[in-house]
Structure formats: structure tokens, C-alpha cells
């Protein structure tokens, strides 16, 4: 038995890293949802009565040691006490029932089934965290602190949880030079130049944040990968990250460039059926696993947007993926992205991934996962679910979501994305259940929005999307509202009235962005390359499917993309029980109307308005939604610290300006096409169309 502040002397390195990790000395957002702001009144008194001994079996396990340290951090904050007052009792003999005033850890209990599963049992006298493995105790600690941080009484906390999906992964689009593709929160957090000798303490805080929401895998580099990241010097760098993150239950993955045997291996080809190529990849995998025994595997973007792949040699995606899968063997996984479209394919771009991959169903190796974007186009503010979900019944598939807001405002304002992801997860595929039910046995990936900015995500509210991704990957049955309230209570305030206001802002924010950027199912109307701002007038890019005009198809007669049997027939890729709901404009959800149908401007909608009138009304609704958010946030000044309140106020001022820009530029363009007057009482665009067309942003971030 040991007593004192220190946890386990054998883990001094971990403790040192935790102490070195940057701590916010002001409310600057660095602490994210792990602020552990002091409780007040009876809530603090209830918790203080439990602030006695901590009994822990397996306390010398590094993950259990971290769980205890997280408990201490949380209690120190919630009770507003100095760390010097900590008292620890570490004992390998875990009491069968919790002593009074104690926290009890039982981290090797076979009665708790499932990897990462845990139970938290609270009473007025003790709180017990039980798990089958140390990682369950770490997750259980974060869950306990989440409940306490929302003001829950310890006696009322009764949790029994297991992750809904085994793989809960972040995909970083970070380049080794520090640039982040589609990144809007500064530079990359990965300091490759100084690894492996120097580990940035921020890597520990990053791991803490991920573990607190159940993220257990990280792809550290861009899918548009550099081959040299497979060289020995980078394997050594990756090993340092893997060693630091392992106690947090996080495995590292690499995006692999398919042509690496040719690029850095001295071979004349990267043909997956060439024995020398297969041998090169096998040797490379062996080299990585010798350094990192729990290496997760490779993520591959192949034959898409100029990236090399097996089709360069007349081979299929399955042949390419299976060659890599054989190299890795049972040690890890090959994650193969289904985001493909080709310049020489004149069919509807939204059909091409299905056409390429569905015929390959059942041909992929068991350790291959097909990673499918939420919709068939490209992370638009609203798309229908991807038709590949449910159509690959003999292939392991996972969902790819985008946490970074490439098409939803980038680094300005608020766009809470949990409702977007819930739309997809809850969608019935007509082929074996909802999207969530189909991907739950495998996993969910999110394109990260994390960068070097002090608050991690560029804006304070973008942290909610990182948080929501992790929570939904852990439990897709959670509602968007539940997650919003959880996050806001831990991030800003526990004041009930303020929480209701913040949650309402968040829940309406994505719909506002949809309305002022792409209402009624319009999509891909953004600026070229940087994807910032409106540009529905762009019609002359090299490839047709890069042009906004390709998608909206507006002229004086109408607007929209006919994807029914009379058009591209992409609707036929959905299950026969699902397609009919979108086949007739009269029964199509208005939110997807112009995604599936081309209609006359005078077409009458169920609202009683013409299509043109409804389109204008939606743009105005989007602007009004942002105005309401700004007013609601202004009302919260007494409840929010001045530093973050001012920062969000500035973000919303930018969003108000951008919403009007989108609205005005779009209406000016649609009027130039249809020749129609604005409905009575509608405010005209502030500038002529020519002024909007002249705006250029060569310096926009994230390109």
C-alpha cells in the first residue's frame, strides 16, 4: 500500500509529460471540454464528501495511472482545491464494496464485457468504476467527470457503457511541412521536424481530448500522401507518437501513397500483382510493426483526384487493397477510401463510386475496410446518404464524416454538425437497416478540424464538432441535443437558461448554413479551389464535374439536377424500397428537392410558393437564422467569460456578413439566369452580380 500525491513511481515519464502539457491560464479554449470548472453550493458539497481515498487495483498499469491522474485533475477543478491536498491509496487488493468517501477502481473484472466497456456505480458514500481492461477504467473516468461536470449528484450516476463501434478514428489531412489541407485552425499540430527526439507536450493534451470522447485511432497524415513518410526516419517519428498515445488507447495509422514502391523503393512499377511490389510492401509492413507492434494500418486514397492506384496498371480496387492487406496480415487493417471519380467518366459524378465499388462486393480481404463518405458527392451541407451503404453486404464498411467545415463556413461562425451526421446515421438504407446499423460493426472516421490555434479548432464552437463526432462514434443513439448540452455545460456554463440558449443556437446553426449556401438540395456552389464563398456562376473549369453549373444546371427554364429515370438515373442505385420517396417531386423531401429533380422556376411547392419564391425565402431564412444566433449569443454576456464571449461575438459578426454575401450573390446570379423579379418586399442584393464575380481569395486558408 502506498500513500501520497504521486501515483506510481514507475510512470514518472507519463506524469512528467502530463505536468508539462500546456494548461490554460485563461479561458482561451485550450482546455476544451475538460475545463472541470468549479462546482457551486450543494453540488460541490456532495462531491466533497467523496473526496477521500482512491482504491485502485493494477495501479502500476500506465493506463490505470492515467485514469487516476484524470480523476485527480477533475476533482481538483470541480472542488477548486489545490493539488497538494490530494490523498491516494493504491492497493492491488480491490475491496469488494467501496469504502466510505472513496473512489474504487476495478480494472480487470471479467463481468464487464466488451473492449473499452465500463460501469460507473455511484452512491452517497462511494463511486466505483469497473472494467474488464485498463482502457475501460480510463473511459469510465472521463464519463464520470462528464456527469459530474454537468452538475450530476454522485449518487445518481449509474452508467453501463460499451462503444457502439470498434474503430473510432480521426483522419488528419496534415502534410509533413505543417500545412493542413482543408484546415482552418492554424498549422498542423504535428511537429515532425523535431520528432522523434522532441515530443511536443501538446501531443499529450491531444491524446487526452481524444480519449475523453472515445477516439481510439488517428491517421496522422494527409490522404494525398507523401511517399517519404514510409521511410525509416518517419517510422521513428511515428513510433514516438505511438508510444505516447498507447496508454490512452489510441493506435496510429498512416496514409500510404500507392506508388511508394516506385517513388522511394527503387522499383520500376507499383503494380499490385507484381511479386516484387508485394514483397516491398511486406518488408515495409514488417519494418513498421517491428517498431510499432500495435500499428493500426494504412489508409489509402487511390485513383482519385490524381492520386496513383491499382487502376494505373489495369487492376481493380480490390486487387490493390488486398495486396496491401496481405502485407499487413492479421496485425492491422487497410482502409480504402471509396471517394473516386474520373475525368474520363461522363456519368453523373455522384454515381461513380457506386459503379466502381459495388461490383467488387465480396472481393475484399477480411482485413480491408471500405471507407465511404456520408453522401455521394463531397461533404456538402446536405446530401442524401451514400447508396453504397447497404449495397456492400459482403464487405466491411465504415462511415467517413468531415469534422472540418470545408463547405460549411470553414473558420467562421457556428455550424454544429451533429444533426448532419445524425441524418445519415439514422437513414434507412432499405438494405439491412440504417446506416448506423451497417457501420456499427466496423467504425466511423472523421476528417479532423484540429490545428495549432490555441483553442485547437479555430473557433470555440468548432470544438463541439470534434466532441460530437467522438460521442456519436461511441454511441450513435445519442441525440444532437443531448450532445450539445453536454458539451456546452462542460465548455461554457452550467446555468440552465444559458444552456438552453446555447443548445438552441447549435441545433439551428447547420440548417441556417444550408439555407444561405445551398437550399432545397442545391450543392457544390462554392468558390473554386479554396471552396470559400459563393460562385454558382463558375462554368468553365477544366473538368465538367468541378463546375457549380454542372450541379445546379440553371437556365431560364428551371434549376436542379434530374437524377430520376428521365435524367442520370442515380436514384436507381438506392434500394427499391427507398428510391420511390425521392422519385416524384410531390413526395420528395423539399430539403433534397433540387438534388433529385430539375424543376421550372414556376413549379408550385406544398408551401404554396413557386420554386423561385421558396428559394428566395430559404436564403432569407438562412440570414435570419444567423442574426438570431448573434442576438442570442449577445444575451449570454453575463453567463460567459469575457474573453470567449468576445471571440464568439466576432465569429458571428463574420458569419452574418458571409451569410448576406452568399444570399445576395446567389440571388443576383439566379436572377441573371431566370430573368425573374424578386418577390414583393424582398430586399435586393447589395451589389451588382459583376461585383460578386470579381471577388478573389488566392490567400484563403486550407487549400
Language-model-detected regions and their locations in the chain:
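Feature activates predominantly on carbohydrate-active enzymes
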Residues: 59-70, 74, 109-282, 290-297, ...
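Acidic, contiguous N-terminal accessory segments
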Residues: 26-124, 155
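Bacterial N-terminal signal peptides that target proteins for export
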Residues: 1-11
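C-terminal non-catalytic alpha-helical accessory regions
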Residues: 437-702
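Catalytic-core regions of glycoside hydrolase
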Residues: 266-485, 491, 495
Amino acid at each position: 500500500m502506498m500513500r501520497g500525491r504521486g501515483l506510481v513511481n514507475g510512470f514518472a515519464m507519463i506524469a512528467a509529460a502530463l505536468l508539462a502539457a500546456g494548461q490554460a491560464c485563461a479561458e482561451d479554449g485550450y482546455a476544451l471540454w475538460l475545463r472541470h470548472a468549479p462546482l457551486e453550493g450543494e453540488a460541490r458539497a456532495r462531491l466533497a464528501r467523496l473526496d477521500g481515498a482512491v482504491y485502485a487495483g493494477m495501479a502500476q498499469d500506465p493506463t490505470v495511472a492515467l485514469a487516476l491522474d484524470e480523476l485527480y485533475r477533475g476533482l481538483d477543478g470541480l472542488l477548486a482545491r489545490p493539488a497538494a491536498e490530494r490523498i491516494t491509496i493504491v492497493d492491488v487488493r480491490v475491496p469488494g464494496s467501496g469504502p466510505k468517501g472513496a473512489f474504487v477502481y476495478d480494472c480487470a473484472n471479467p463481468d464487464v464485457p466488451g473492449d473499452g466497456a465500463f460501469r460507473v456505480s455511484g452512491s452517497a458514500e462511494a463511486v466505483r468504476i469497473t472494467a474488464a481492461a485498463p482502457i475501460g477504467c480510463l473511459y469510465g473516468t472521463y464519463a464520470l467527470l462528464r456527469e459530474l461536470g454537468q452538475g450530476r449528484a454522485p449518487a445518481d450516476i449509474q452508467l453501463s457503457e460499451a462503444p457502439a463501434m470498434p474503430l473510432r478514428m480521426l483522419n488528419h489531412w496534415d502534410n509533413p511541412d505543417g500545412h493542413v489541407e482543408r484546415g482552418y485552425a492554424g498549422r498542423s499540430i504535428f511537429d515532425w521536424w523535431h520528432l522523434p527526439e522532441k515530443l511536443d507536450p501538446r501531443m499529450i493534451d491531444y491524446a487526452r481530448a481524444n480519449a475523453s470522447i472515445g477516439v481510439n485511432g488517428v491517421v496522422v497524415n494527409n490522404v494525398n500522401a507523401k511517399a517519404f513518410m514510409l521511410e525509416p526516419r518517419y517510422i521513428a517519428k511515428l513510433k514516438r507518437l505511438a508510444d505516447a498515445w498507447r496508454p490512452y488507447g489510441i493506435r496510429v495509422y498512416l496514409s500510404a501513397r500507392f506508388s511508394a514502391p516506385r517513388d522511394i523503393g527503387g522499383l520500376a512499377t507499383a503494380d499490385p500483382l507484381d511479386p516484387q511490389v508485394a514483397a516491398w510492401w511486406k518488408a515495409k509492413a514488417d519494418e513498421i510493426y517491428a517498431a510499432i507492434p500495435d500499428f493500426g494500418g494504412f489508409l489509402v486514397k487511390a485513383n482519385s483526384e490524381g492520386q496513383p492506384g491499382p487502376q494505373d496498371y489495369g487492376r481493380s480496387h480490390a486487387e490493390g487493397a488486398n495486396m496491401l492487406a496481405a502485407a499487413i496480415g492479421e496485425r492491422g487493417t487497410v482502409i480504402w477510401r471509396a471517394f473516386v471519380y474520373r475525368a474520363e467518366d461522363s456519368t453523373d459524378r455522384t454515381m461513380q463510386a457506386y459503379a466502381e465499388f459495388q461490383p467488387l462486393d465480396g472481393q475484399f480481404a477480411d482485413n480491408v475496410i471500405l471507407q465511404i463518405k456520408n453522401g455521394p458527392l463531397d461533404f456538402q451541407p446536405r446530401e442524401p446518404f451514400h447508396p453504397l451503404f447497404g449495397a456492400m453486404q459482403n464487405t466491411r464498411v465504415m462511415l467517413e464524416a468531415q469534422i472540418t467545415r470545408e463547405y460549411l463556413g470553414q473558420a467562421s461562425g457556428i455550424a454544429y454538425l451533429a444533426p448532419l451526421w445524425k441524418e445519415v446515421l439514422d437513414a434507412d438504407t432499405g438494405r439491412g437497416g440504417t446506416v448506423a446499423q451497417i457501420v456499427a460493426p466496423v467504425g466511423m472516421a472523421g476528417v479532423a478540424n484540429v490545428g495549432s490555434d490555441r483553442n485547437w479548432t479555430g473557433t470555440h464552437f468548432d470544438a463541439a464538432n470534434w466532441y460530437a463526432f467522438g460521442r456519436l462514434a461511441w454511441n450513435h443513439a445519442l441525440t444532437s441535443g443531448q450532445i450539445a448540452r453536454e458539451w456546452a455545460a462542460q465548455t461554457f456554463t452550467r446555468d440552465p437558461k444559458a444552456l438552453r440558449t446555447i443548445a438552441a443556437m447549435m441545433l439551428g446553426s447547420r440548417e441556417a448554413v444550408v439555407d444561405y449556401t445551398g437550399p432545397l438540395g442545391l450543392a457544390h456552389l462554392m468558390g473554386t479551389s479554396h471552396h470559400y464563398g459563393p460562385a454558382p456562376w463558375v462554368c468553365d473549369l477544366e473538368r465538367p464535374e468541378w463546375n457549380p453549373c454542372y450541379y445546379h444546371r440553371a437556365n431560364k427554364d428551371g434549376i436542379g439536377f434530374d437524377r430520376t429515370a428521365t435524367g442520370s438515373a442515380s436514384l436507381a442505385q438506392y434500394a427499391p424500397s427507398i428510391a420511390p420517396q425521392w422519385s416524384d417531386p410531390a413526395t420528395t423531401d423539399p430539403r433534397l428537392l433540387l438534388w433529385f429533380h430539375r424543376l421550372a422556376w414556376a413549379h408550385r411547392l406544398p408551401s404554396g410558393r413557386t420554386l423561385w419564391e421558396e428559394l428566395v425565402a430559404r436564403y432569407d431564412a438562412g440570414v435570419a437564422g444567423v442574426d438570431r444566433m448573434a442576438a442570442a449569443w449577445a444575451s449570454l454576456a453575463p453567463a460567459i467569460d469575457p474573453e470567449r464571449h468576445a471571440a464568439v461575438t466576432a465569429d458571428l459578426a463574420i458569419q452574418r456578413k458571409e451569410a448576406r454575401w452568399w444570399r445576395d450573390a446567389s440571388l443576383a446570379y439566379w436572377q441573371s439566369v431566370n430573368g425573374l423579379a424578386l418577390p414583393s418586399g424582398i430586399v435586393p442584393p447589395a451589389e451588382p452580380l459583376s461585383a460578386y464575380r470579381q471577388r478573389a481569395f488566392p490567400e484563403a486558408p486550407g487549400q
